[in-house]
């Protein structure tokens, strides 16, 4: 009896302790006990005594399995997030390389000139915004391809210049085949977009400009200073491209903005060549500033081309492209940049060259804004032409009547018209 009572007391203690695991040893015991209390029916005291230790082991195994699964899920999530972060970093790296290969800021300026040409070429107050977007997108792709090819051909030169040695190709951030593939895809996509959404004339001008820039201007930079004038032709084509995309043809009015761009680029690049002459010499480029140590020749060239831009405002008004206000604005703007060029001509220092360079940066957006602000639509042009024709016809009729009147009058001797006392002047004579 004594043994049975001792065994019974010991088993009851085991059952109580096994049914309520110690939370200090197993932190999840309370939750597990709560789950077991709702999910399992009550059992007898003897069965609990026999299975107490087994229940604790099964609960511990269940907790361990749950913790292992949670750790595995956490590790999988961390691995996925690390892979996503690596892919995002890789995408950011190549996106930056494409941005620098395309010379995005310069390409945006090209797109701005092309878009201005498109708006001027519409000739009407209503502008086709889808056509404008297609033109700008195609121009951007062509410019990105041309600039990328330019950097591919000039890897060795760029590696010797301070301002270009950190570009993607000289620094090794992207391979040459990768850059070639990018330039090819961008150029082909831009030409196809212009051909399908605008017209073949615009696509042809864009493709020709790409070839002229990448395969003529780029190698010519290392051969002869005339490369600056060839590059000016390249810069003058985008507004012509935009005009052709809008109207499908090239007219006299379409040449005003390209002419302004051509003459504007000369003082702009002369100032840049003077400021970066040491870098150009290190890179092996044949710029005019390297053959003009005093800077007098490049200053004279810059000043002369500034004067060439003065008549453009009058021509734009005379040809019916803009209103008369543009004459005044264009003249004042051109005289302002000519003043900086004259200042550089008198005192050929880096400070004066930098002032002329900054003035050239300001000139182009203001000039294009004036063209857009004062442009005259086709209807207004026709009205002006009709008014001018009516004025000319009225003045012509007056001249004809006066001529007929003079012919109808008989010839009068000079003596009869003289103030003679006894010979009065003829009645039809009007002094």
From Swiss-Prot:
One of its GO terms (cellular component) is mitochondrial inner membrane. The keyword Transferase applies. The keyword Metal-binding does not apply. Converts protoheme IX and farnesyl diphosphate to heme O. It is a multi-pass membrane protein. Its EC number is 2.5.1.141. GO terms for biological process: heme biosynthetic process. Keywords: Heme biosynthesis, Membrane, Mitochondrion, Mitochondrion inner membrane, Transferase, Transit peptide, Transmembrane, Transmembrane helix. This is Protoheme IX farnesyltransferase, mitochondrial. Disulfide bonds: none annotated. Residues 1-33 form a transit peptide.
């Amino acid at each position: 009896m004594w043994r049975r009572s001792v065994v019974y007391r010991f088993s009851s203690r085991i059952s109580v302790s096994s049914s309520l695991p110690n939370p200090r040893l197993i932190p999840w015991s309370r939750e597990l006990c709560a789950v077991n209390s709702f999910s399992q029916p009550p059992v007898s005291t003897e069965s609990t005594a026999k299975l107490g230790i087994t229940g604790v082991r099964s609960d511990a195994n269940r907790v361990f399995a749950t913790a292992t699964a949670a750790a595995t899920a956490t590790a999988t999530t961390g691995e996925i997030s690390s892979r996503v972060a690596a892919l995002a970093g890789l995408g950011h790296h190549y996106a930056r390389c494409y941005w620098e290969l395309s010379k995005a800021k310069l390409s945006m300026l090209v797109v701005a000139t092309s878009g201005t040409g498109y708006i001027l070429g519409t000739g009407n107050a209503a502008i086709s915004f889808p056509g404008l977007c297609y033109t700008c997108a195609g121009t951007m792709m062509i410019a990105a391809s041309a600039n990328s090819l330019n950097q591919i051909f000039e890897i060795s030169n760029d590696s010797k210049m301070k301002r270009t040695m950190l570009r993607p190709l000289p620094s090794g951030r992207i391979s040459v085949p990768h850059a070639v593939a990018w330039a090819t895809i961008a150029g082909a996509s831009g030409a196809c977009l212009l051909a399908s959404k605008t017209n073949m004339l615009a696509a042809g001008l864009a493709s020709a400009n790409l070839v002229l820039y990448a395969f003529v201007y780029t190698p010519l930079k290392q051969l002869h200073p005339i490369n600056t004038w060839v590059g000016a032709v390249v810069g003058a084509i985008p507004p012509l491209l935009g005009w052709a995309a809008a109207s499908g043809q090239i007219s006299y009015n379409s040449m005003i903005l390209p002419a302004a761009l051509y003459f504007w680029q000369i003082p702009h690049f002369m100032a840049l060549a003077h400021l970066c002459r040491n870098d150009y010499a290190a890179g092996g480029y044949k710029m005019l500033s390297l053959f003009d140590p005093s800077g007098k020749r490049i200053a004279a060239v810059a000043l002369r081309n500034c004067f060439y831009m003065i008549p453009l405002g009058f021509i734009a008004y005379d040809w019916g492209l803009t209103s008369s206000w543009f004459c005044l604005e264009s003249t004042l703007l051109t005289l302002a940049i000519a003043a900086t060029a004259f200042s550089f001509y008198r005192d050929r220092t880096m400070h004066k060259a930098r002032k002329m360079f900054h003035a050239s940066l300001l000139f182009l957006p203001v000039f294009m804004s004036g063209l857009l602000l004062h442009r005259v639509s086709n209807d207004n042009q026709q009205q002006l032409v009709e008014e001018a024709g009516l004025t000319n016809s009225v003045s012509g009729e007056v001249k004809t009547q006066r001529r007929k009147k003079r012919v109808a009058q008989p010839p009068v001797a000079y003596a009869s018209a003289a103030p003679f006392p006894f010979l009065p002047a003829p009645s039809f004579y009007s002094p």
